Design a protein with these regions (language model features):
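Nucleotide-activated chemistry modules centered on ATP-dependent adenylation/adenylyltransferase
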Residues: 1-252
Length: 252
């Protein structure tokens, strides 16, 4: 079975379209890892893709309840032994005692006691890679063999340029990157050829349509987000305050 990681972005959409053209929609499944930090238009677009292509797209959303309790226990039992002041411990526990917020991105930041950054992209690992991998393993149990198609392109970064097009990881599980050597123009061309609209955010000065905003977003795009979608900037500011409450230094 072909499993395509769908993000709502142009590259994963082109990958989905390639899989459908080569194998037919009946032999393709999609999986969307909902980080809890997406734009509403992206959620709508993923639903549109499922309806337009006929491919079932499974929505995945991390639950950090167990990790949350472990972190709360660590703060309550270990911080005092490490000399952390009682006021700081009480401030952090006040947040954890409310329980998980139910938003994967925010819960992860609270547990980590910080926001992700370009040098600490734990968001990708925990919110996307882990749930998608777990889902692929579940599919292996059902289908016996799963080929995970990933929409990454070499011209996006030096690290991605070094990735192979195909990897067999054993146990019937493999990874294929069909658009690794494609350009952005090639990607949008695939949309046009299949009669599929791109994510509307691309027409609103956005170059990234995953997390809103992504930690890798440049200043120009942040400026565009603040003008077009100020509510997302306000939301991040609110989340920074919450995360700051569990930080020893009172910042996010």
């Amino acid at each position: 079975m072909i499993l395509v990681s769908v993000s709502g972005g142009k590259d994963s959409t082109a990958t989905l379209l390639c899989a459908i053209e080569l194998h037919g929609p009946e032999n393709v499944k999609g999986a969307f890892a909902d980080t809890g930090n997406e734009h509403a238009e992206t959620y709508d677009y993923v639903r549109y893709l499922q309806a337009a292509t006929g491919v079932q797209i499974k929505w995945l959303r991390q639950d950090f309840s167990e990790w949350w309790l472990q972190r709360r226990t660590y703060i309550a039992e270990k911080w005092p032994l490490k000399g952390v002041g009682p006021d700081i411990v009480a401030r952090a526990l006040a947040v954890f005692d409310k329980g998980p917020t139910g938003n994967p991105f925010l819960d992860l930041c609270i547990i980590k006691m910080r926001f992700p950054s370009r040098t600490a992209q734990f968001c990708t690992t925990h919110l996307k890679t882990e749930p998608l991998t777990e889902h692929a393993i579940e599919m292996l149990d059902h289908y016996g063999a799963v080929e995970s198609w990933q929409g990454v392109r070499a011209d996006e970064s030096p690290n991605r340029a070094r990735l192979p097009s195909y990897e067999y990881l054993g146990g019937g599980y493999s990874i294929y990157r069909p658009i690794l050597r494609w350009t952005a123009d090639d990607v949008f061309g695939a949309h046009r050829a299949a009669g599929i609209k791109p994510n509307p955010l691309y027409l609103q000065d956005m170059t990234r349509v995953g997390c809103m905003p992504c930690i890798n977003t440049n200043k120009a795009e942040l400026r565009a987000i603040s003008k077009r979608f100020p509510e997302h900037i306000d939301r991040i500011e609110e989340w920074e305050h919450v995360v700051g409450e569990v930080s020893k230094r009172h910042n996010a």
